[in-house]
């Protein structure tokens, strides 16, 4: 779960720590969930024992059949970036000026009214991770002349105007969009009756290696979920106080959701260690991938627990949370609504355990994550899982050509949700709200 909660946070000891990477940790079940800290960087401090704390996870949803015979439902509406004000971008009158350099604007690019030049400059800078240096102290006035002279001040002005880096699609996201468009065109082309001379279509098949990998992923997920059952009683219970607005009730709700988030993060770490190829990466790349994919995997797991009838999400056994419960815990509506919309859209796909496990693996092995060193190897690993998912979906959804691109586009939607999550965590920091050490470390919230 996400942690930009507005209720006061119980005191957390900064000295207690749990090393999620240590396989032979001692028992520390007596420690409270919120007091554990995940040491994600190479540090000289000695981590304390983790014990059962590193074995926690959310309740497993009812397992679905590995070989479903249910045909996928029609295409659902994709999640789109949500702003505080709903509705389409204002219509252009033709005389608008670029918010960065004052040139003639061509439209709204990356959340800002800007010209084609500043649009392209911002995109190139973000994709390349460019670092510019101003030779005039960083205070150049920006206009159509200076935009060509000082790139640092131009990039700063882009950000000050409101351009959002998360709106820039990576090469992989562009490739996924192109793939979806091609799949749609192929589906339309093949919707006509086939000619008599057309050769029979050859469906892809799962190789023995792919089948073994999928079986291992499903077994690993089920094992991680089973480990969480004995730890569910340690989560601070949802308050049933007569006064739901009392300080004590707000603190309980905050602790409840933060501890659920800790449980989820630790389960993600356990599962990632079981992914073929993950432990062969450097420790630094393992940490970089986990820190930036954790919230996306948490949201995927959340969508598995969505109940369309009651529009609620079940985390603990026999306890469901609706939108109002999320709000009572301190989450803001700008994030609550996208969570439920994404969960509803995922539920309509009716994915089984194998498809969820492959999607999670693809999300974790994203080479464009910050601070990833061996990007080529991460891309190779991700490609292995993408190919396995494509073959699996083609076999189990032979009459739905759009199922595979639909599933991959959900990962693009997750990037949007992840950016909203980052904004909320940053807002929490500005409000001087303290997260438990594990969540502060995984989301880079440093005091």
Curated annotation (Swiss-Prot):
SMART domains: HOLI, ZnF_C4. Residues 1-88, 178-203 are annotated as: Disordered. Pfam families: Hormone_recep (PF00104), zf-C4 (PF00105). Belongs to the nuclear hormone receptor family. NR1 subfamily. Keywords: Activator, Cytoplasm, DNA-binding, Metal-binding, Nucleus, Receptor, Transcription, Transcription regulation, Ubl conjugation, Zinc, Zinc-finger. Gene3D superfamilies: Erythroid Transcription Factor GATA-1, subunit A (3.30.50.10), Retinoid X Receptor (1.10.565.10). It comes from the Eukaryota. Nuclear receptor that exhibits a ligand-dependent transcriptional activation activity. Interaction with retinoic acid receptor (RXR) shifts RXR from its role as a silent DNA-binding partner to an active ligand-binding subunit in mediating retinoid responses through target genes defined by LXRES. LXRES are DR4-type response elements characterized by direct repeats of two similar hexanuclotide half-sites spaced by four nucleotides. Plays an important role in the regulation of cholesterol homeostasis, regulating cholesterol uptake through MYLIP-dependent ubiquitination of LDLR, VLDLR and LRP8. Residues 95-170 bind DNA. One of its GO terms (molecular function) is nuclear receptor activity. InterPro entries: Liver_X_rcpt, NHR-like_dom_sf, Nucl_hrmn_rcpt_lig-bd, Nuclear_hormone_rcpt_NR1, Nuclear_hrmn_rcpt, Znf_hrmn_rcpt, Znf_NHR/GATA. Residues 205-447 are annotated as: Transactivation AF-2. Residues 1-96 are annotated as: Transactivation AF-1. One of its GO terms (biological process) is negative regulation of proteolysis. Its main location: nucleus. It comes from Bos taurus (Bovine). One of its GO terms (cellular component) is RNA polymerase II transcription regulator complex. Heterodimer of NR1H3 and RXR (retinoic acid receptor). Interacts with CCAR2 (via N-terminus) in a ligand-independent manner. Interacts with SIRT1 and this interaction is inhibited by CCAR2. This is Oxysterols receptor LXR-alpha. Residues 187-203 have a biased composition (Low complexity). A zinc finger (NR C4-type) spans 98-118, 134-158. Residues 209-447 form the NR LBD domain. It is found in: Nucleus; Cytoplasm. Ubiquitinated by UBR5, leading to its degradation: UBR5 specifically recognizes and binds ligand-bound NR1H3 when it is not associated with coactivators (NCOAs). In presence of NCOAs, the UBR5-degron is not accessible, preventing its ubiquitination and degradation.
């Amino acid at each position: 779960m996400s942690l930009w909660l507005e209720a006061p946070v119980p005191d957390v000891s900064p000295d207690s720590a749990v090393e999620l990477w240590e396989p032979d940790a001692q028992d520390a079940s007596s420690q409270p969930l919120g007091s554990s800290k995940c040491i994600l960087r190479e540090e000289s401090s000695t981590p304390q024992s983790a014990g059962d704390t590193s074995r926690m996870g959310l309740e497993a949803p009812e397992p679905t059949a590995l070989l479903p015979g249910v045909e996928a439902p029609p295409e659902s509406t994709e999640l789109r970036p949500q702003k505080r004000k709903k509705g389409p971008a204002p219509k252009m009158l033709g005389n608008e000026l670029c918010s960065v350099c004052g040139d003639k604007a061509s439209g709204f690019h990356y959340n800002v009214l800007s010209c084609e030049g500043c649009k392209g400059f911002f995109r190139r800078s973000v994709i390349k991770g460019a670092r510019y240096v101003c030779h005039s102290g960083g205070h150049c006035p920006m206009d159509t002349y200076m935009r060509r002279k000082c790139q640092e001040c131009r990039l700063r002005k882009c950000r000050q105007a409101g351009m959002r880096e998360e709106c820039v699609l990576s090469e992989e996201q562009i490739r996924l969009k192109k793939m979806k468009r091609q799949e749609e065109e192929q589906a339309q082309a093949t919707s006509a009756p086939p000619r008599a001379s057309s050769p029979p279509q050859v469906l892809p098949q799962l190789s023995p290696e792919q089948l073994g990998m999928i079986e291992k992923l499903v077994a690993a997920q089920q094992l991680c979920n089973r480990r969480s059952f004995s730890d569910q009683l340690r989560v601070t219970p949802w308050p049933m106080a007569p006064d739901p607005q009392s300080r004590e009730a707000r603190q309980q709700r905050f602790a409840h959701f933060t501890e659920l988030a800790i449980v989820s993060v630790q389960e993600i770490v356990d599962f990632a260690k079981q992914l073929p190829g993950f432990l062969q990466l450097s420790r630094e790349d393992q940490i970089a991938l986990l820190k930036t994919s954790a919230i996306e995997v948490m949201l995927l797991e959340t969508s598995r627990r969505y109940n369309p009838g009651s529009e609620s999400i079940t985390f603990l056994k026999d306890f469901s949370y609706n939108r109002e419960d999320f709000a009572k815990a301190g989450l803001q509506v700008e994030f609550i609504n996208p969570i439920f919309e994404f969960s509803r859209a995922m539920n309509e796909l009716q994915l089984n355990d194998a498809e969820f496990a492959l999607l999670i693996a693809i999300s974790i092995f994203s080479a464009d994550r910050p601070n990833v060193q061996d990007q080529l190897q991460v891309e190779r690993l991700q490609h292995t899982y993408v190919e396995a998912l494509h073959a699996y979906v083609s076999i189990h959804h032979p009459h739905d050509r759009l199922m595979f691109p639909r599933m991959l586009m959900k990962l693009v939607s997750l990037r949007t949700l992840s950016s909203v999550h980052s904004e909320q965590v940053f807002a929490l920091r500005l409000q001087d709200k303290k997260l438990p050490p594990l969540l502060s470390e995984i989301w880079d919230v440093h005091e």
